[in-house]
Amino acid sequence: MGSEMCIRDRAKIAGLKMCESFNLQYGTNYIAVMPTNLYGPNDNFHLENSHVLPAMIRKIHLAKCLNESDWGAIRKDLSLRPVEGVDGTASEGEILSVLHKYGITGPSVVLWGTGKPLREFLWSEEMADASVYIMEHVNFEDTYQKGTKDVRNCHINIGTGKEITIAALADLIVKETKYQGKVIFD
C-alpha cells in the first residue's frame, strides 16, 4: 500500500502543478482544490483497500456482530462486500479466520497505529458544495499575493478545520454502534 499512496500523492501534486502552470503560461483560470479526508454515500468499505473512516466503521460493526453472535448480520455484510473471496455463504470457520486476519474478533478489534494521529474529515457532499462555490467566486489571481515573483501553492485546501484523533473517532464509532468489546491499537 505504501507505493500506491506514493503514486497517488504524486499524481495529486502533478495535477495541482499542472493547473498552476497552465494558468501562468496560458492565462487560464483553473482553480485546484485539495480536500481533506472525505466520507459519504457510496464510500468504500472493503477491508483490503478502504480509507480510515469506512474501515473503522466496518471493522467495529463486524466485531460487534461477532461479539453478539449475530451471524445473520455478518453473512449479510460479507455477501455485500466479500473479504478476500470469503462471502456470506462461507463456513463460520472461514469467516472467523479471514476476520481474525484483519484484527476483528468478538471481544476486540485491532486498529492500526497508536490512535494518536489527528485527522480531519469532511462529508463528500460538502466538498462538492465548496467546489461549486469556488468555481463561481474565486479566480486564479485570488490565490496568490500580487507582485510575488514566484507563484506557488495556489491550490485551495478544503476542510472543516476541526481535527479528531483516530482514538477519539474509534470511541465515537464504538458509542454509536454500541459495541461492547475492546478497541486495541497496534
What are the residue ranges of the model-derived segments?
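C-terminal substrate-binding subdomain of Rossmann-fold SDR/epimerase-dehydratase oxidoreductases
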Residues: 62-186
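Phosphate-handling active-site elements
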Residues: 2, 26-27, 143
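Short, small-residue-biased leader/transition segments that mark boundaries at the very start
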Residues: 1-7
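Active-site Tyr-X1-5-Lys
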Residues: 8-36, 52-68, 72
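A short small-residue
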Residues: 34-38, 111-112
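Active-site loop immediately N-terminal to the catalytic Tyr-X3-Lys motif
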Residues: 45-46
